[in-house]
């Protein structure tokens, strides 16, 4: 049973006496200081997790009480999630961290139907929430008082005086010839109910971004996790589940030549994915995060309609803003191009939606109707195969009940009847020495050797192979 952590916030709001403060998100002129105080109410005998599945916060904004409901984002990581960095001698070092008890949440404000929230609870509360049509950010204050947080509107963050930042995709650039203009579409309400799709993301951080954050891999990792948490939330409107499959940090040197020319860098990254990356990681769409300043104020670029293509299912994004959400909007924008979307035009009646060509001063987390039409057409015309595969059963989390043939929260294996020799029936944990309990790539409690066929192809499709690192049968990245 999912436990609910009730947190009452004793809020003290102090008007700031001064010109501004500097936070990780930027310089602020107007903000509120809040002091959260946790009061936990768990049922008798319940075991408290480090990060609860559900949380509730009560506090005030502009003197008015609000109740923030949060639920852990269960779909954030793929079952075979890996983190990769490099040793000084260039060796690839891969880790498979346990991410079940992570600290990333989605939520809403009570009695506000249009509200949303994306919050990290890793080190205090950090993220954003939408309240009465306005976006607020919250983050810890780096003061001696560790409980102090700042709450502020996005519009109150001082903006740099620089030309508008924009996407580098030109209309019809590298698009499939059969992608139609939104004005030509006749999409019925039935079609608008998008079929469920699943995108496994690979994020690759270049050496420039690694240097930008002083070689602090932990800080970069948390930042990327927050980005994916935001992307996951934005893509729900399209009935797309986005999970992070691999995070690779180029800690020693760049593995491609990252140039100021966005088109050149994108071409090089796509070629590298096709020839190198797909041979060693399982993912559907790869993005390069870079600190490089591209020519022409460009902050991102991606092939239109490239999803599932070995060379074109890619995007490049500049880490252009201290606020995670703003960069996440750009990442979602570029992935939108891969899903067949063009930029919003005047007829779309939305100059601040995700697919706007120029980054808005008030970034939106919504897709326009034009974008939805483009996406529907892309699915109809091309039916990209790599995003059809549903998450493995370990992505399904519910109340732990032994023997229901699902891996539940806290279970390593299903310990129902008949008895699983790899599974301790008392704890639903793997027995000592066991790597797995079941799955197409599990045999006698061990992962099956890499390269073994685990799913035979149908028709003109391709066989799927075990990777030697997980019990699931990963989707062949070269599927059409």
Swiss-Prot record:
GO terms for molecular function: metal ion binding; metalloendopeptidase activity; toxin activity. GO terms for cellular component: extracellular region; plasma membrane. Glycans are attached at residue 279. It comes from the Eukaryota. Zn(2+) binds at residues 333, 337, 343. Disulfide bonds join 308-386, 348-370, 350-353, 413-428, 415-423, 422-445, 436-442, 441-466, 454-473. The active site is at residue 334. InterPro entries: Disintegrin_CS, Disintegrin_dom, Disintegrin_dom_sf, MetalloPept_cat_dom_sf, Peptidase_M12B, Peptidase_M12B_N, Reprolysin_adamalysin. It holds the Pfam family Reprolysin. Expressed by the venom gland. Binds 1 zinc ion per subunit. Residues 399-480 form the Disintegrin domain. Residues 21-190 form a propeptide. PROSITE patterns: ADAM_MEPRO, DISINTEGRIN_1, DISINTEGRIN_2, ZINC_PROTEASE. It is an enzyme of class 3 (hydrolase). It is found in: Secreted. Monomer. Belongs to the venom metalloproteinase (M12B) family. P-II subfamily. P-IIa sub-subfamily. This is Zinc metalloproteinase/disintegrin. It comes from Craspedocephalus gramineus. The lineage of its organism: Eukaryota, Metazoa, Chordata, Craniata, Vertebrata.
